[in-house]
Amino acid sequence: MKAVIIGTAGRSHKELLTDKTWPNMVAKARELVPKGAMGISGGAAWADHIAVELYRLGHLSQLMLHLPAPIDNINCCFVDGYMGRVKSAASAANYYHGMFSQVLQRNTVQDIVEAIQTIGCGYTFQPPDMGLRAMFVRNALVAKEVSEGDMVLAYTWDRGELSDSGTKNTWDQIKISNKQHVSMFDMVI
């Protein structure tokens, strides 16, 4: 069975994303995702990173990451090849992982680097590009990974239906019945 884990990267409700929220997010996924499943994620901070964490903990047997940009294994960051301040998938990923890393007091991109260096983890990345188009290409790759019998977990700040977002973009592309929405408000202590 494959388990796709997607959702908030930390763009909203930053004040509620704490070192106490994170364990609740991971615990909820451990409860819902069968042990030994293959995890799939887009490599973003917070919700997507739950798949990396479950793999690190041995809960997932394999992991497939569809990253929005190349990753520098030495400096543990996403790279885009542009000099200066350019809005890109890499700069966005680094920004949100930077905030996430501060909360957890560890480099979460390093978690990804360590995961992709193991035999049980595969990954793809989008080529460097200005703008955020690579995020949507990555979303499509994540969505294509699943078929009936698999599952999707989406962690968002919505209650009920998902609002317009990158998570909803991926959610809408996935055509299986086992799709579960986890409200982040339920993860906050």
Where are these regions (language model features)?
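Acidic/glycine-enriched connector segments
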Residues: K2-M187
